[in-house]
Structures are given as structure tokens and as C-alpha cells.
Amino acid sequence: MKTNALRDMTNDELLQKLAEIRQALFNLNFQHVTGQLENTAQINKNRKDIARILTILHEREQKTAA
């Protein structure tokens, strides 16, 4: 997911998206372990999306704290 699209979302939307991506990552890891996953690049993509969302949330926390 693009960073600009994430920055346009509210905190509630970001938290909801974060939960969705974490659930998808869990499912992908499960499929990977059982040998059913064909596109392993999806795991890294989801990890990076999680990091992007957390970074944006932390930046917003820092702005409000300052």
C-alpha cells in the first residue's frame, strides 16, 4: 500500500487496516508452513505495510506530544 494513501486515512482507519493486515500475515505464515503458499513475496509485502502503518501512527503521536 502506498504511504500517501495511508497518510490520508484517520487513526481509526489505520488501526483497522493494521488489524486486517496482521490477520492476513498470520494466514500467509500458516499457509507457508503447510506448503500451500505459492507467492512468498506477499509475506514481506505485508510486513512492510505493517511497518508503514506503525510509523505513521508513531509520527502522529509525536506531533501531538510536542
Curated annotation (Swiss-Prot):
Keywords: Ribonucleoprotein, Ribosomal protein. Pfam families: Ribosomal_L29. One of its GO terms (cellular component) is cytosolic large ribosomal subunit. GO terms for biological process: translation. It comes from the Bacteria. GO terms for molecular function: structural constituent of ribosome. Transmembrane segments: none annotated. InterPro entries: Ribosomal_protein_uL29, Ribosomal_uL29, Ribosomal_uL29_sf. Belongs to the universal ribosomal protein uL29 family. NCBIfam families: L29 (TIGR00012). This is Large ribosomal subunit protein uL29. It comes from Syntrophobacter fumaroxidans (strain DSM 10017 / MPOB). The gene is rpmC.
